[in-house]
């Protein structure tokens, strides 16, 4: 695990003590009050840093949505680039950083993150900037959300195997499905999307 700054350690201790005393996590304002500051922006930045380092998880839309991670169970996975949730886009495989998750969320080894670009999967609640947790596997079942390579370009879509073709279906009516007729194009499954992570502002 990455080392914490003095302020991050203080925030983590405040959360831990509050959980031990009250049985539920503190709000941003309660943390700010303990830190002796008036606003919550600084608290949010500390929580974001603690989440990136694998010490806690936050639940979007909840005033008390903080869960501490078991430090012995945390693991950091690489963010290996960008995948387009829209038109086909060349795959980018430069590691841009790492993101920590609990080991219990991994079904197998080799998993990695891709950052989502585009809006073709918005009805599946996948939006630009999300981190897609990808489990490498060479095949998929119907309705799986996958990262697929079509003629060397990557896309994130819902997978359907039909009689003589593969259909990669967007979850946005503004986009057309990608149809791969048998034998006409080279297509491969990079992996199945098994989780979506969104970093709160």
UniProtKB/Swiss-Prot annotation:
This is LexA repressor. It catalyses: Hydrolysis of Ala-|-Gly bond in repressor LexA. The gene is lexA. Belongs to the peptidase S24 family. The active site is at 120 (for autocatalytic cleavage activity), 157 (for autocatalytic cleavage activity). Homodimer. It comes from Geobacter sp. (strain M21). Keywords: Autocatalytic cleavage, DNA damage, DNA repair, DNA replication, DNA-binding, Hydrolase, Repressor, SOS response, Transcription, Transcription regulation. The record marks 85-86 as: Cleavage. Its EC number is 3.4.21.88.
């Amino acid at each position: 695990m990455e080392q914490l700054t003095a302020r991050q350690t203080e925030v983590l201790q405040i959360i831990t003590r509050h959980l031990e005393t009250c049985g539920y996590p503190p709000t941003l304002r309660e943390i700010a009050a303990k830190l002796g500051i008036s606003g919550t922006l600084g608290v949010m930045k500390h929580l974001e840093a603690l989440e990136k380092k694998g010490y806690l998880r936050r639940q979007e839309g909840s005033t008390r949505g903080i869960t501490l991670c078991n430090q012995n169970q945390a693991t950091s996975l690489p963010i290996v680039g960008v995948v387009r949730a829209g038109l086909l886009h060349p795959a980018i495989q430069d590691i841009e950083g790492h993101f920590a998750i609990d080991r219990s969320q991994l079904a197998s080894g080799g998993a990695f993150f891709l950052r989502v670009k585009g809006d073709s999967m918005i009805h599946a609640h996948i939006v630009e900037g999300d981190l897609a947790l990808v489990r490498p596997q060479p095949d998929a079942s119907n309705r799986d959300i996958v990262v697929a390579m079509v003629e060397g370009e990557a896309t994130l879509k819902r997978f359907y195997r039909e009689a003589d073709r593969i259909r990669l279906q967007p979850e946005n009516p503004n986009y057309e499905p990608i149809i791969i007729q048998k034998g006409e194009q080279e297509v491969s499954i990079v992996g199945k999307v098994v989780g979506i992570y969104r970093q709160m502002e």
